[in-house]
Regions:
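Alpha-helical membrane-targeting segments
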Residues: 3-14, 103-109, 185-205
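A conserved amphipathic terminal alpha-helix motif
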Residues: 192-231
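Glycine-rich portal/gate segments that line the openings of hydrophobic small-molecule binding cavities
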Residues: 81-153, 236-238
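Hydrophobic ligand-binding cavity/cleft-lining segments
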Residues: 2-94, 99
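Beta-strand/loop substructures that line and gate deep hydrophobic ligand-binding cavities in soluble
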Residues: 127-205
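Hydrophobic pocket/interface hotspot
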Residues: 58-59, 68, 115, 180, ...
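Structured catalytic core of nucleotide-sugar glycosyltransferases
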Residues: 41-47, 113, 228-239
Length: 239
């Protein structure tokens, strides 16, 4: 009797060995792809503190830009190159333009900033082509010198957009709210990538440093606690 042999069926796999040309996968992803988006669009970081001191000395300490390099992390130098005209309320001159040197994420850069102080309320600094968010009436004492108002800090290599804005709000006799909003955009993805691990922490680090300085100065100099802005000169009483 003849033996009947059946051919073994061919097993078909459900796995596709090839993908269509429309489903191409990037073999080597661009490490700067995300950073490129971050460098072109300004990022905003915020931080807030409530301090148990009057608002006047807190504001004066925050507006004391020449002292930043002595206590502020990442700030290596802070020089004021122009001062405002005396404001109409306190007769004080305020920082109006400065050169700050900062370093973080392996990058060190010096850049010009225009500074705008609304006594007792705001301290704002802007760099590059960034415009102030404050009204002309609020910063009239900064605009009396037309040359300052028209200056642009377009020579910054590190940042193409920069705005830091301190808001000081009196919440009670010895209670003050302090808020910091920091906007920045790097000039290219390389800088954004290098600073990626550090940049998100900057606002909180800055406001913590100011908080510590306020507490230290006012405990060492109790007379500053009750002083008005007219009696203060930066981080000390007028002599």
């Amino acid at each position: 009797m003849a033996t009947i042999r059946c051919a073994r069926p061919v097993l078909q796999t459900s796995h596709r060995l090839f993908q269509s040309h429309n489903q191409r996968r990037t073999f080597l992803p661009n490490p700067f792809a995300a950073a490129s988006d971050a460098s072109s669009t300004p990022q905003t970081l915020t931080a807030h503190r409530t301090l148990s001191f009057p608002s006047a000395p807190i504001y004066s300490i925050i507006a004391d830009v020449p002292s930043y390099a002595s206590f502020l992390p990442y700030c290596q130098r802070s020089d004021i190159t122009h001062w405002s005209a005396p404001d109409k309320t306190y007769g004080r001159r305020w920082p109006s333009e400065g050169v700050l040197s900062s370093g973080f994420g392996g990058i060190t850069e010096s850049f010009k900033s225009r500074v705008y102080c609304v006594p007792g309320k705001y301290v704002e600094s802007v760099g590059g082509d960034t415009e102030t968010s404050l009204s002309r009436d609020e910063i009239a004492h900064h605009l009396e010198d037309a040359g300052v108002g028209s200056r642009r800090s377009g020579d910054n290599v590190l940042l193409k957009h920069l705005r830091s804005k301190w808001t000081i709000e009196e919440l009670g006799k010895n209670k003050t709210g302090v808020s910091l909003a920091l906007e920045f955009a790097f000039t290219n993805p390389f800088y954004a990538a290098l600073s990626g691990g550090v940049a998100p922490k900057v606002a909180d680090v800055m406001i913590r440093a100011f908080e510590q300085r306020v507490v230290a100065l006012l405990k060492e100099n109790p007379a500053m606690v009750t002083a008005s802005l007219a009696d203060l000169d930066g981080s000390r009483l007028k002599r």
